[in-house]
């Protein structure tokens, strides 16, 4: 089997493209069921965040990439967006290296940001829950998690707080004076929404409104702060009227706040959702300030240098970790092949041996029976190597012939 990944991320695709190809907000079990139904797709892990959507796969034929792209394209709402214009294909070792760097935060818009590791772990867990991960892919992810833990403990790559959530709040502070007199509406109580809430509470605003599909989760988060309340998403119309700052971090398939919902009050809109939850046209209204994930990059750049010198140390750890993984995989593959070879030999010998013993018990000459037994075993054991050598010779594969000669202790010079 071959290991591949297909990805769309912020490096090549702007937010409007990433929004179209995002797989978040969809029925996860349905996604896994549909991708595993594709011929030659054996296992899969689907990762979808605000900055990237990536699919990690074990396949039996590289030609299946066309079918996977067609599968992905089927979830795009706007047919003008063609996945072939944006996706990146990685194969083999490149997949593992990328995933290690990704989990360590080296591939993030926010260098070293810690959230991505949790998102990768969540994706892995969902894959296991949907019986979509196999032994090899499981070993890859376990090594990735161990590597990320080592990088976090042995470097300071994540010590400067420049997460997307932190940067979003920094941006809001720049846009509004005296935030202690402002009402803040946060839409979404997931991992990012909770992080946003923590950063906002540190600014001590007048009031925080946290809206979520399930109010229980929002209530649990808001219970830690006096001036905060939990609401359902269905309460948005009345919450928008009260809010001075609206920040969205929620999985939706269409805009949940549009121009006609906001009136003439001046507001700051920050949307870190993928797909986008706040209509970008809100920024066209003179009284509003509107920012999306890509805009936040300007805030991030200021702090990036503080982490860059740590990234080289992280890279060295990753390279060593990858080398260790590949060495262990070679041993696993070798041991598996050796085990299979012995099982094959046992099967050949056991069948012929039983027949030979039966002949001896029936009075056949033991010497003749043993000679016949040895002849049959020789033919059976050498059958596949001989066929392979003939095929290699026909194809002009002298390298295969040399390899086979070495396997059987033959003279490679002849």
Swiss-Prot record:
Superkingdom of source: Bacteria
Residues the record lists as binding NADP(+): 188-193
Entry keyword set: NADP, Oxidoreductase, Porphyrin biosynthesis
GO molecular function, one term: glutamyl-tRNA reductase activity
Residues annotated for substrate binding in this entry: 49-52, 108, 113-115, 119
Catalytic residues identified in the record: 50
Pathway where this protein functions: Porphyrin-containing compound metabolism; protoporphyrin-IX biosynthesis; 5-aminolevulinate from L-glutamyl-tRNA(Glu): step 1/2
CDD domains reported for this sequence: NAD_bind_Glutamyl_tRNA_reduct
Reaction catalysis annotation: (S)-4-amino-5-oxopentanoate + tRNA(Glu) + NADP(+) = L-glutamyl-tRNA(Glu) + NADPH + H(+)
Domain notes: Possesses an unusual extended V-shaped dimeric structure with each monomer consisting of three distinct domains arranged along a curved 'spinal' alpha-helix. The N-terminal catalytic domain specifically recognizes the glutamate moiety of the substrate. The second domain is the NADPH-binding domain, and the third C-terminal domain is responsible for dimerization.
Protein family: Belongs to the glutamyl-tRNA reductase family.
HAMAP family (alphabetical): Glu_tRNA_reductase
Miscellaneous field: During catalysis, the active site Cys acts as a nucleophile attacking the alpha-carbonyl group of tRNA-bound glutamate with the formation of a thioester intermediate between enzyme and glutamate, and the concomitant release of tRNA(Glu). The thioester intermediate is finally reduced by direct hydride transfer from NADPH, to form the product GSA.
Protein's name in the database: Glutamyl-tRNA reductase
Species, as recorded: Francisella philomiragia subsp. philomiragia (strain ATCC 25017 / CCUG 19701 / FSC 153 / O#319-036)
Lineage of the organism: Bacteria, Pseudomonadati, Pseudomonadota, Gammaproteobacteria, Thiotrichales
